[in-house]
């Protein structure tokens, strides 16, 4: 099995199959008990680990220059009406918070206090657009900068006008980001790939941009924050990780978070 771990990137699947066979044998009473279970579980997926370690930095996060280019591209597309204000604000929000896109999708106006400049992350959306707990069931309050506060205030006003056209009243329960889906349903929650698709469309119009995804933005904020001298513990807290071990994967080199990792990165390339 150890040799297989060195040869196959999908070793976890193989390990699971082998364990299932012995569990089944135990169930059918061919063996007294599955003595191999703990032994097998201790064999690490070394091939997969090596592949992850061999990934180039540019495949994992954006440099400051590349990130700046993405912001510029979004600004240009907004000015030329190639994207909607909602899409621009969604991109900004997801980067600044350094959150999971499903958590941005699940934001409701009751979670945003522009007066106190705070956003509470308390839920996410599953692939069926239903609310679920955040990863680890964490509830986190982020302090947000003036730039994001202003964008959210403007978008809230605009959304209220747009919803009124369909006789929908904007309430605190209203989701911050919604759209008209392919079936014509108005005020529908965003589907899982919504932000990915918007970023792809921006990339098509600006082919010079480095490849990026919402998850890569999360890696970028964490890595640039680390390069700016922020401690691993502070980044771990801002990313709502349960420990710094998970955070090390990201940085590659109700908690209240005073400055999200995205803002730290943003401040540095604005200097």
Regions found by a protein language model. Give the residues of each.
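Short, basic (Lys/Arg/His-rich) helix/loop patches that form interaction surfaces
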Residues: 75-84, 160-168, 172, 182-189, ...
């Amino acid at each position: 099995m150890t040799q297989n771990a060195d040869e196959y990137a999908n070793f976890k699947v193989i390990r699971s199959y082998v364990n299932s066979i012995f569990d089944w044998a135990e169930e059918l009473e061919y063996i007294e008990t599955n003595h191999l279970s703990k032994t097998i579980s201790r064999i690490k997926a070394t091939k997969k680990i090596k592949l992850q370690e061999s990934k180039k930095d540019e495949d994992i996060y954006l440099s400051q220059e590349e990130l700046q280019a993405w912001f510029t591209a979004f600004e240009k597309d907004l000015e030329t009406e190639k994207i909607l204000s909602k899409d621009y604000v969604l991109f900004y929000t997801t980067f600044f918070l350094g959150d999971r896109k499903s958590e941005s999708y699940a934001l409701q106006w009751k979670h945003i206090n522009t007066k106190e400049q705070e956003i509470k992350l308390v839920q996410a959306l599953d692939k069926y657009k239903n609310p679920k707990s955040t990863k680890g069931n964490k509830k986190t309050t982020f302090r947000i900068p003036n730039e994001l506060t202003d964008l959210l205030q403007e978008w809230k006003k605009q959304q209220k006008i747009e919803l009124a056209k369909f006789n929908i009243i904007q309430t605190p329960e209203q989701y911050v980001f919604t759209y008209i889906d392919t079936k014509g349903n108005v005020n529908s929650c965003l589907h899982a790939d919504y932000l990915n698709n918007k970023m792809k469309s921006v990339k098509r119009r600006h082919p010079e941009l480095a490849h990026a995804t919402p998850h890569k933005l999360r890696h970028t904020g964490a890595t640039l924050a680390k390069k700016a001298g922020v401690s691993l513990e502070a980044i771990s807290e801002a990313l709502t990780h349960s420990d710094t071990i998970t955070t090390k994967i990201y940085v590659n080199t109700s908690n209240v978070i005073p400055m999200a990792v995205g803002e730290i990165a943003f401040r540095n390339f604005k200097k």
